[in-house]
Amino acid sequence: MLPAPLARRLLCGFLRGPTPIVTRNGVRETLLERRCATDYSSRHSAGLGRGLPRGATATGGNPGGADLEESFLFPEYVLDSESEATLQDQLRELQQRQEEEERRIEQQREERRQQKLGAGRRVHQVVGHPDPTVPPSGQNCSGCGAELHCQDPGVPGYLPSEKFNSAVAEEGGLERTVCQRCWLLVHHRRALRLQVSQGQFLELVSAALRRPEPALVLYMVDLLDLPDTLLPHLPALVGPKQLIVLGNKVDLLPQDTPNYRQRLRERLWDECIGAGLLPPRGYRRAQRSSGDRPRGGEDNANLPSKSSTVLRDVRLISAKTGYGVEELISALQRSWRYRGDVYLVGSTNAGKSTLFNTLLESDYCIAKGAEAIDRATISPWPGTTLNLLKFPICNPTPYRMFQRQKRLKRDATEAEEDLSQQEQNKLNLLKKHGYLVGRVGRTFSYSEAQKDKAAFEFDADSFAFDMGNEPVLAADKSTKRVELTPEDVKDAHWFYDTPGITKENCILSLLTEKEVNIVLPTHSIIPRTFMLKPGMVLFLGALGRIDFLKGNQSAWFTVVASNFLPVHITSLDKADTMYQKHAGHTLLKVPVGGEERMAGFPPLVAEDITLDEGLGESEAVADIKLSSAGWVAVTPQFKDTLTLRGYTPQGTVLTVRRPLLPHIVNIKGKRIKGSVAYKTKRPPALMYNLQKKR
């Protein structure tokens, strides 16, 4: 059916056009004349019928009855050249209007999309004013540890003078108060740029570690960022103190073989020893393969020849999902016991603040500490912690360790359906975040009776064998405010969370808060595999690029990066044009902000790569690490040699290393028909300290 406007135009043209012609018995006459004749016959048909004799028909009784026979008229509309041209113009005009309407709708959609992008980049206005005349408070921010003040917004611990003065006027008003930076990080996911250099962070950490008292150092590394997460000056920073290395974020890595955790642990041992740390006595270092040599022919040339830092142990954990945390606590209580303070050290974004909060809720902190101490600020933005945060360590008396072991054995016999609905919901959420999930609990909690008489109670830790003063088991939390008294912290040893040390040549320093949230993986990584031929190019957002220049056969390229960071495949002749057109826009996603953002973003710098002796279609020969944005595991055909070219932004580092997950190419589905990509496959999450469903 024609649209109403078009039908109206055609009808008007029909009425204005020439008179239609009809054909009857081979004679052409106008429709108007035929209509008049028909009307005349209709008006006289009654009289004609009454004048016929009975039984006669209208045709049989009249010689001219043939003229009265019923016949069908078919109008024959004949258009002259002028009307035909008019109709074509009208159709052309209608088509133009439809095209204009489509362009208008598309323009409105683009405007709405730009408005949404602009809303995402909207800056929350920082209100308030500084007052340099007001002295610092002497009270630290409960989120980052910086001293609260209102003098300079660029100095850590700043609060607007209006809020600072009103809080000081109230008794205890600055207690548990967070600075403006922590507030914006938590509530608006925005980070204020502070005037704090890497040298200031190093000096703060070094000053804490130079204390003469015995101390244990927990050095946390990001497994996704090996080997760049190991600081080259770590031995000089730690000194002669004992050291335990914690490989964090193991929950984000998929299982490529059944023994992959043991292989990752051995790999971490090798990386730490290669960084200049002394292994413990009796440790046998695995033989290094040819593919593990640093590029450029140098073999740790910049590392100190002598080191006094002894590496006691290496452990894999997940501070977020709790995997390995209970085992870490048991190891610390058995080996270190209560001999001194413990310092948590590491680079930015390693997950130190997350582990601090997890241990605060565990048996490693005194029962009252979990009620009295606020949690550290957690954010993907580098350098969240700006000063030392601490909690008192629980003294592992024989009674406490006995009760703890009873709880761990009881927890290990429970099945998922035995847990409360709240615990089940928490575990289901953690399974979505990581492949390895563990339960972290508390053996003792602070009771209501103890809260009421806290000011008059002696410290339980100072009476190691006085079981009457032990915290009671499992009690509900109260909303009453709890404070640590001098008796609680008398002769106590502390667990310190130190500021993160900024890594040099890291791509995260070039990104905004929104871009960091996209690039840093927070959920279990799903590998994405592509089969590329020579002459093809792989883009990881607009942050990295790998050109496949030469090879005898196709090869597999497996991307291990944040699931939100897009991968785009194109040909070598189109790669430059595609980058110039789509960098900063939706297709490549990061950076965000269009041409204006890319104008200040460093250009990509190339570096040639040669990979020799492919091991076959089931084992990668090397990882190409694109700074901290992720890596690509390359799997050539057997004995094939590949010539590649990698790109990263200027000022960042591209690293070729032994494959961290050499068999990750096997974690894929079927190849997508007509595409170079394979369907993704997510391995199931593994639950520890919990029985399978009964």
Curated annotation (Swiss-Prot):
GO cellular component: mitochondrial inner membrane
Membrane topology: Peripheral membrane protein
Localization terms from the record: Mitochondrion inner membrane
Main location, first listed in the record: mitochondrion
Region: Disordered, residue numbers: 38-69, 93-138, 280-305
Residue span(s) of domain CP-type G: 202-504
The keyword Secreted is annotated on this UniProt entry: no
Biased composition (Basic and acidic residues): 93-114
Superkingdom, taxonomy of origin: Eukaryota
Main function: Involved in regulation of mitochondrial protein translation and respiration. Plays a role in mitochondria-mediated cell death. May act as a scaffolding protein or stabilizer of respiratory chain supercomplexes. Binds GTP.
Name used for this protein in its record: Nitric oxide-associated protein 1
Species of origin: Bos taurus
